[in-house]
């Protein structure tokens, strides 16, 4: 979604006396940060909470290798279509997350979540 689209939806809600959006579920993590350009500034301006899905980028921010040995990791076409195209450059970020996890004696996932909370994310959506 583009920023102007979200803004227009807020105007439509206001003009029709509907409840405006207070939370937005968006795709946002250390490997995918497109929303920082338009949407997140509008969310901040309008006091809208962020609830990103895929905070661990399909598991890529939870392990120091790109490939997963799980059945899902081998067959999940959605994760592959979202992330595999930029594997080479994204692995640089994954390596940094791994280094920080070692430095602070914690899990890579904790670093990824801490980054989101530092960016103002109210509640990342995770599925176990």
Could you say what each language-model-derived stretch is?
Residues 72-81:
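Short Lys/Arg-rich basic patches
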Residues 35-72, 107:
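Aromatic-lined glycan-binding groove of carbohydrate-active enzymes
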Residues 55, 85-128:
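Conserved short secondary-structure transition element at the edge of the structured enzyme core
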Residues 6-9, 43, 123:
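Hydrophobic packing residues within well-ordered alpha-helices of enzyme cores
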Residues 2, 28-32, 54-61, 115:
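Glycine-rich beta-alpha junction loops
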Residues 19-25, 47-51, 122-124:
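Structural preference for beta-strand elements that scaffold enzyme active sites
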Residues 17, 47, 101-105:
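Glycine-centered helix-boundary capping/hinge motifs
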Residues 1-38:
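Glycine/proline-rich, positively charged
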